[in-house]
Amino acid sequence: MSHLEAEALRRALGECTIGREIVVLEETTSTNDAVLQMATANTREGLVLFAEHQTAGRGQRNNRWESAAHKGLWFSILLRPMIDISKSARLTAWAAETVAKTILQELALAVTIKLPNDVCVEEKKVAGVLVEMRAQENAPHLAIAGIGINVNQTVEDFSEELRPHAISLAIALDQPVDQQEFAVALLRNLDRTYREIFASYESGSSSLLLDVKTRRRRRIN
């Protein structure tokens, strides 16, 4: 059974903004809801909250997300991007693409993105993103980027209904994945790409969404 260690994650991330504060809960209803409950106007962006198990994880359109205990990465990031609430799809695209590229770079698995928020391996869903934004008085807008990744589930861990459509990284690799190491790599990439991409939105120079917007499914290279 894999357990995430908050302090070890924090040390490994060094000066990263995303991951400047890390919380690991054994169980919560939804990591997005847990972050929203913690956030105040003074909460700095970069807080990351993991849960070893979600009892009411959800995806787009409030679809239920199965979150097997200790078998995946279920987490949410508190952000304060300088974008309008109506542009939250940009955050969804950023998170999905960064998850996909990290899977490719770290595990050498072929990955596709199925809009608006699914990351797929072998044409099956391995990860999903749910971004929610809120206006706050006297503070930049609050964005919560929820990410769920199936890491070490076996086929039996998925319900019969999901088995034809879901996969884990371990199933695709035929071996378990070190969740702590993968989490560090992903958070580093999320931190770097968040700063790079959102800094370029004001000038209209972002290259991330051009391709994502124009294709319903595309392969990550």
Give residue ranges: language-model regions.
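N-terminal lobe of the biotin/lipoate ligase/transferase fold
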Residues: 1-106, 177, 195
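Long, positively charged amphipathic alpha-helical accessory segments at protein N-termini or as interdomain linkers
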Residues: 17, 85-111, 121-221
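Short loop/edge segments at beta-strand edges and connector loops
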Residues: 26, 113-115
